[in-house]
Amino acid sequence: MAPPNDPTNSIFGVPETDTKKNSFDLSHGKFSVKGVPLLSEVPSNVSFKPFSSICKSSDAPLPLFQRVQSTSFNGGFLGFNKEEEPSDRLMNSLGKFNGRDFLSIFRFKTWWSTQWVGNSGSDLQMETQWVLLDVPEIRSYVLILPTIEGKFRSALHPGTDDHLMICAESGSTQVKASSFDAIAYVHVVHLNTFKLLEEKSAPPIVDKFGWCTWDAFYLSVEPAGVWLGVKEFTDGGVSPRFMIIDDGWQSINLDSQDPHKDAKNLVLGGTQMTARLHRFEECDKFRNYKGGSLLGPNPPPFDTKKPKVLISKAIAIEQAEKARDRAVQSGVTDLSQFESEIERLKQKLNQMFCGNEVEVGCGSCCCKAEANYGMKAFTNDLKTKFKGLDDVYVWHALCGAWGGVRPGTTHLNSKVIPCKVSPGLDGTMTDLAVVKIIEGGIGLVHPDQADDFYESMHSYLSKVGISGVKVDVIHTLEYLSEEYGGRVELAKAYYKGLSKSLSKNFNGTGLIASMQQCNDFFFLGTEQISIGRVGDDFWFQDPNGDPNGVYWLQGVHMIHCAYNSMWMGQIIQPDWDMFQSDHLCAKFHAGSRAICGGPVYVSDSLGGHDFDLLNKLVFPDGTIPKCHHFALPTRDCLFKNPLFDNKTVLKIWNFNKYGGVIGAFNCQGAGWDSKEQRIKGYSHCYNPMSGSVHVTDIEWDQKLQATTMGEAEEYAVYLNQSEKLVLATPNSDSIHITLKPSSFEIFSFVPIKKLVLATKFAPIGLTNMFNSGGTIQSLDYSATSAKIEVKGGGNFLAFSSGKPKKCCLNGGDVGFEWSADGRLTLNLPWIEEAAGISELIFLF
C-alpha cells in the first residue's frame, strides 16, 4: 500500500516518537513483530539491525527523511554472515513460516514481474522481489524487501520445509563477499540511489492520449504509414497528443552484413534481436524522407493493407521455421523440404517489399545532409499538419539496439559480450528475447563511456524533434557484468549516464522505462526516471498457440499492472501499456486504463479503430479524464488469486478530484503454472464471478486531498456499465455484482452535499465516459446552489434529492430532466474555444 500521509496513522497504528522501541525483535531463533512470531528456526547467522543504525543520512528531501525517521521503529535490516569462503552468489535461510497468508511479486521473465500468493516459505517463487505477510493478530502487514548492499543485489527464493531463502549475488565471479548487514529490509527504506515518485515530475504525456506504432507495423514502420496512422485518429475525432515510433526506425544490421548498411525487410520481433546499432541516426526508411512530401494535396499513395500483408507473410515464415525446429527435435535429418519452403516464403516477402515501397524522398545520399530530409523533416511535418501532436517519442534498447552497438561502427568502445544468465532465472518462463540475446551476445559500450553513449544518441534525437524515448530491454545488463565489477556497478554507470542525458535532452522527464521490472532498476535507476511500465506486453493473442489466449491473456495483463503498482507506483508513475481498440477484449482493457491514473495509448493497426470506444476514454482535444492517484488493489484482494481461484473479482481503487472510483474486473481464467514455469489458460475458471463493493474499499487516507471525501456521511454511487445510481453510507451494506468473464464495472463514489431545505446533491459527471468523475474540473457549493465546471461533451448526471429551480449553462438558462429517484440529467456540448469546459449552475 502507499504510505499514509499522516505518520500517526501508519499500518502499525503507533504514535510517532524518536524513542519508541522497535516493533521487530529477533531472539532465540524467532523473528517477531510486536510479539507476534513471523519466522521460526531463524539461523544463528542471521542478524536484525534497526533502521537508524544503518541509514544515518540521506539525499532525500528533509521532510521526507524526517517522515521516515519518525516511523523508523517500524523497520530494520536483516543480514547474514557466512562462515565460509567469500562467493559471488550466496543463499541463506531467513527462517520459516507456515499458515500465514502472503502476497508477493516475482520475476516470471528476466524483465517482467507478477503477483503470487501462498501461505508458507516454500510457496514462494524464484526471484521474488518482495513479500507481504498478513498479520491479522495486530491488524497489520509486514513487508520483507530484498535490497542492495555494496555490490550485491538480492531476491527471495523458496526453501524446503517452509523456509524463506534470500539470495545475494554480484553478477561477477570477481566480486565476492561472505557477510551482509542490510541485505533485506522490513517495512520501507530510502537508499540514495533512487527517488520516490513524490520527489519527481512525471512527463506531460501522463494526462494525454497517444498512439504507438508497434502492433500496427512491427519492424516495417515507415514515414508514410505513421503519417496515415495519425491522420486516421485525427479524422476520427480522437487526436493523439503523443506518439511512440517503436522498434524499426533505427540503423541496425547483423554481424554477417555490411557494417555500414541497414538490415533490410525486417518485419516481426525476433529477427532483429541479434542485430546491432551501427549509427545513432535513423535508418534509411526515415533518413530518405523529404520534408513536405506528405503535406501537399497529392501525397504519395500508401496501401493500408500493406502492413498486415507483410506481417502475415512474416508469420508464415516464422511458423515454417518452427516446424523445421520441431522436426529437428524429433530426429528428422532431411530438412531440405523445410529449408526450401522457408526460402520460398522469404523470397516472396522480399518481392512484396520491393513492389510496395513508397517514395517519400529522392533516395540520394547527398540529400541526407540537407536540413529538409530525415527524421527532423518528418517530425516537423507531423507537427505542422497535426497541431495537437505535442510529443514524438522513439524506441531504443538500454544498450542501443537489442544486440547493442556494433563494434567499430561508432566512435565508442563497444565489445560483444557473451551473456551469462543467473541461476535465479532458471525457473522463469521461456522467452524468445532471452534465447536470441544469448545467441548473439550484446555489443556493450564500455561503462566508462555510458555518459557519451547516451549523450550522442539523445542529443541527436532532441535536435531532430524527438521529445522522449521509450527505453526497452533494460535488464540485459545483468547478463553482461562479469568483467565490469558486477551487476550493481555496471548498472550504476549506465543509469548515471542515462539520467544525465534525460535531464539534458528530454526535460528530465521524457523517458518511459520498459522491460525493467526488477529491483536493480528500481533501487539504482530511478533517481531521474519517473514513469515506467507495470505490466508485461499487451498480447492480442497467445504466442504459444492457445486460441483462447485472445481472452485470458487480457486478465493476466490487468493483474500484472494492478499488483506491480503497489511497489513500482511508489517510485515511478505506473504505465499500464497500450492496447488495440478493435481487439475482442478492448472494452475490458479500456475500463482499466480509464481509472489507472496513467497515460492512455493504443497500438491500433491502420483502419483498426473503434472510435466509439475511444470516445469513452479520450476528450476530443486528446486529453483524458485522468485519476489523481495510481490504481491499486483493494485490501480484500491482497492475499487472493483473482486469476484462477475461481472466486475472486479483482477490484482496484483510485481518486478523482471530487470523488473516489472502484473498478471491478473478472480476470479469472489464466495464470502462472509453477510446475510448467509458464503462464497458461485455466479454462475451468473462465466463468461469471460474483463480488461486492463498498465505499470503505477506497483508501481515502492515501492522499491528503481525499481525506475529507472519506469522511462524508453519504455517497452517490454510479455504476457506469449498468447505468445504475444508488446511495451508500460507510455503514450500509456492500453493493453486490456478478460479472461475466472478461467484463467489468466501474463505480464512481461522490460525497453528497446537503443544501437548502435538506436537499442532497452530488455531481457524477459525464456518463458517456468510463471515468465519469474525472470530467468534473471544479465544484463550489453555497447554501442554495451548486456550481460545477465539466470538461467534455455528452450526458451529464447528478444526484439531487430535490428538483432545482433552474439551471444555467455557460451563462444562459437551459432545460434539464429530473426524476423522483434523484436523477438529474442534461446534455453538454463540447466547446472548443473553452477547451471543452462548460460551467453549470444549479439553483435550489
Model regions: which residues?
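Catalytic core of carbohydrate-active enzymes
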Residues: 563-565, 571-582, 593-596, 601, ...
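Aromatic-lined carbohydrate-binding/catalytic grooves of carbohydrate-active enzymes
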Residues: 204-488
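Glycan-recognition surfaces
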Residues: 405-459, 496-613, 627-649, 654-656
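Non-catalytic C-terminal accessory domains or segments of carbohydrate-active enzymes
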Residues: 2-127, 147-155, 164, 637, ...
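Substrate-engagement module of ASCE P-loop NTPases
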Residues: 373-384, 493-507
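Flexible loop/turn segments at secondary-structure boundaries
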Residues: 217-221, 250-254, 399-405, 476-480, ...
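Eukaryotic intrinsically disordered and solvent-exposed regulatory patches
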Residues: 118, 194-198, 217, 228-232, ...
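Carbohydrate-recognition beta-sandwich/jelly-roll modules
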Residues: 2-243, 247-304, 325, 348-350, ...
